[in-house]
Amino acid sequence: MSPAAGPKRWALSGRIVTMAAEGDVIKSGTIFIEDSRIAAVVPKGQPAPTGFETTNPVATGGTIYPGLIELHNHLSYNILPLWQVPQPYGNRDQWQNAKSYKTSVTGPMSAIALADDGSLLPALVRYVEAKCMVAGTTTSQGITLSNWSGTIHKYYKGALRAAEIGSPPDLPRAHSKIPDIDAEDWAKFDKELKSSSCFLLHLSEGIDTKAHSHFLALRNPQGDWAIEPSLAGIHCTALDATDFGTMAENHAKVVWSPLSNLLLYGKTTDVAAARTAGLTIALGSDWSPSGSKNLLGELKAAKVVSAHFNLGFSDFDIVAMATRNPAAILKWDAKLGTIAKGKFADLLVVKGVTGDPYAHLIKSREQDIVLVTIGGRPRYGTKTVMQKAGGSGEALKIGSSARVIDFSSPDQDPGIEKVSLAEATSRLKAALGSLGALQTDSLAMSDAIARGTVSRTGWRLALDEQFGNNVQLRPRLAYDGVRTGPDLAAVAVTDEPLHPIKLDGLTVAGDPVFLDTLKNESNLPPGIAAGIAVFY
């Protein structure tokens, strides 16, 4: 019998931004990693911990942060480019019915999901996970899969952490799906909230009275609120200071997507009022049709929006919204969100060690990322640093810089083909370039699903809009006799003719049209797009 393998030990050095508190920065230090966890955080000049005496740290030449945690992103849609929003809307049900939305978002995604011959799902999950990792995101929302008849659902297991999968008991699973029957019954909905550690709920997305009614629907006729400490309200754009006070009284939280709010509504959540009320706030980039390309981009949007509207958020506040705050909202803060002994080694290293450490991350571009680790495993980085860290994987380029990315995982979803990023990119480009041909097959499959005559085995995408997943998490509680949830039929497979579209670029650096498209978005207040472009 061969001896059991010992723990994997390695280390990396650089400037360390722990995010434990503002100013808690080690100008030069080393993080020692044993298997999936941080064994020690040691300033320069102090001895290595026991067991690491002969370990040579990887000199990153960069600043080390906790990996970014995103609490709002519909990853399945992140192959689509920015939608040119034709007008400002009052609530999400309005833009869902726009003709250009159906041909730019609903139609293409239905074609990809329902006309899939088995080659597109593996390509899509590979591509959208890469979009996260190359921008330093180590946790995001999960990708929902369904069997072909739509009766069984699960979350895809890949290289990223998924909030809805977690790793119990250390990282409890978040809830982010409400079956209609639960949402229509106030008591059942409230019970669901009480039993959850974190409930990610789309809440009052929009700026009009109808959007606000979704919040009022959380109150029953007796005056009790279905608001619990587990509730993390995504968007909350229709809420005012009084509403945020109600949320704070019940210890709820807020997830903010400033760029998406402005693109669709021309206004954003009153996060200053939310903060004044004492609410914890996290960031989410939403999705590529109306949002930042990644969470690193959303940090920039948050800074620009805060300055534009004089919201008063510091650079530390903004970085906290993508690290310590979301970890606390998920109840993961004992294991993630800050850099400390015993926590999981989910880390992000950005080139350079000078200047304000929080502004340094906000200003960084995708091509400035040196290394990303998840659970102590080097997942993405420069070719040189990945080699020194013992990582391996597929070669790619970000701008003109050589990078390596590793998707492999022992518990990766066994039912999904493992394809390279290059192959995934090729498949998706071809599919999006032939949407008209795919549309016929997708309409036929949609009809077969509706009639219950589907005989295919395996898994397909369960698109958020059509199957009531993440995007539909607003409550559908009765309010003055009216259902407050959206009509899923309104976003069913479209028969509007589809035309070829281009695959959304993996990064801003690799997308020559992203910033110009953003500048042409009519709902953005003057200066927002230009302010974001300055960072690139």
PLM regions: where:
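Active-site microenvironment of metallo-dependent hydrolases
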Residues: 1-51, 73-173, 187-192, 320-536
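Active-site loop ensemble at the mouth of alpha/beta enzyme cores that anchors a bound cofactor
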Residues: 276, 284, 291-306, 368
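Active-site metal-binding motif and surrounding structural segment of the metallo-beta-lactamase
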Residues: 46-65, 70
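Active-site core of metal-dependent hydrolases
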Residues: 142-289, 307, 312
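Conserved, mostly hydrophobic/aromatic
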Residues: 61, 132, 247, 254, ...
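Alpha-helix N-cap/helix-start motif
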Residues: 264-267, 292-295, 338
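Histidine-centered catalytic micro-motifs
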Residues: 67-78, 198-205
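Charged catalytic cores and adjacent phosphate/nucleic-acid-binding surfaces used
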Residues: 252, 278-279, 309-312, 316, ...
